[in-house]
């Protein structure tokens, strides 16, 4: 009986790991809009300071379905020079010059999946190496820390008063590191990232057999830009996701977006074995807005109203001229 109860709790902890690359890390349909969420090497890659907010509600209509809320900030430490202006009060003003190679970023998230909740942050450092006038090689390292919480109030237990369940530490804190690398040119880009590199251990109680190890996750991204004319551009891209479970958690997003005057875009994405995704977005001055709808290809579509993802971003400052060729969502 004791082993049966332990099995129930174990299944509750890993119940969502059969889909979406074990879904121990947040999943995003609009990965092109903010690559920094999955790859720290993108921090400050375009020379701007950017704030991005993302809300994702998965399988709307199903109680305790996955949901994710994320806020990120990234910037480039551009080298500066000073110019003097003749005014009634003499001041020094800064203007960007060509040089800065360091990018910094921060990322806060709250990810809920059934009775499991992860809340944490990431602090990233990126180093960008210019190659010629329109190529860039980047590396990024991020320190992460998050709270893993287990809410058994949302679970159906055989015996909620059993001391075996009450011995579990339902809130634990896990530090870890993420790594990323990317290469960008005017017409294409590729990137690779690893998350949860240290495979943090979930110390769920005093007994050794209660401990569980988090999975390492791997992300491979790539995309290209094909300019049709001065108004239209086609942007195909792909995201490959896996984990230490390898082929059991292998998943791919294949996406094509069409841009009009860099102010509007729409696209279609296919997530293998999971969903078709419709997406659209627009830019107004320095503000960006995007929406994605996931139509499930599995039987869960009969019980939900699809998955919805909304993103908003704003860019501050003036990018150094040499980075403007990168600046496209």
Report each predicted region and the residues it spans.
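Bacterial N-terminal signal peptides
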Residues: 8-15
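Sec/Tat signal peptide C-region and signal peptidase I cleavage site
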Residues: 17-22
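Bacterial N-terminal signal peptides that target proteins for export
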Residues: 1-8
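Subset of outer-membrane beta-barrel
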Residues: 23-329
């Amino acid at each position: 009986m004791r082993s049966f109860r332990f099995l129930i709790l174990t299944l509750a902890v890993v119940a969502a790991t059969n889909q979406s690359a074990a879904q121990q890390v947040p999943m995003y349909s609009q990965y092109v809009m903010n690559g920094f969420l999955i790859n720290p090497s993108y921090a400050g890659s375009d020379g701007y300071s950017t704030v991005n907010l993302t809300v994702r509600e998965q399988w709307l209509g199903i109680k305790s379905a996955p949901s994710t809320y994320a806020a990120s900030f990234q910037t480039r430490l551009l080298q500066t020079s000073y110019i003097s202006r003749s005014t009634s009060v003499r001041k020094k003003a800064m203007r960007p010059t060509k040089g800065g190679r360091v990018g910094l970023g921060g990322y806060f998230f709250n990810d809920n999946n059934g009775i499991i909740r992860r809340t944490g942050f990431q602090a990233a450092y990126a180093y960008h190496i210019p190659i010629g006038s329109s190529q860039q090689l980047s590396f990024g390292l991020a320190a992460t820390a998050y709270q893993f919480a287990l809410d058994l109030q949302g679970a159906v237990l055989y015996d909620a008063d059993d001391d075996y369940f009450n011995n579990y530490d339902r809130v634990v804190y896990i530090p870890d590191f993420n790594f990323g690398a990317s290469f960008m040119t005017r017409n294409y880009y590729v990137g690779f990232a690893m998350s949860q590199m240290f495979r943090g251990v979930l110390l769920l109680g005093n007994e050794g057999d209660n401990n569980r190890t988090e999975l390492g996750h791997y992300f491979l991204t790539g995309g290209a830009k094909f300019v049709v004319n001065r108004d239209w551009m086609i942007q195909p891209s792909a995201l490959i996701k896996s984990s230490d479970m390898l082929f059991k958690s292998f998943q791919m997003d294949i996406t094509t977006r069409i841009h009009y005057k860099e102010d509007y875009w729409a696209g279609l994405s296919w997530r293998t074995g999971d969903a078709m995704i419709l997406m659209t977005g627009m830019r107004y001055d320095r503000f960006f807005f995007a929406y994605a709808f996931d139509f499930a290809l599995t039987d869960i579509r009969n019980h939900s109203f699809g998955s919805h993802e909304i993103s908003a971003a704003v860019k501050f400052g003036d990018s150094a001229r040499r980075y403007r060729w990168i600046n496209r969502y």
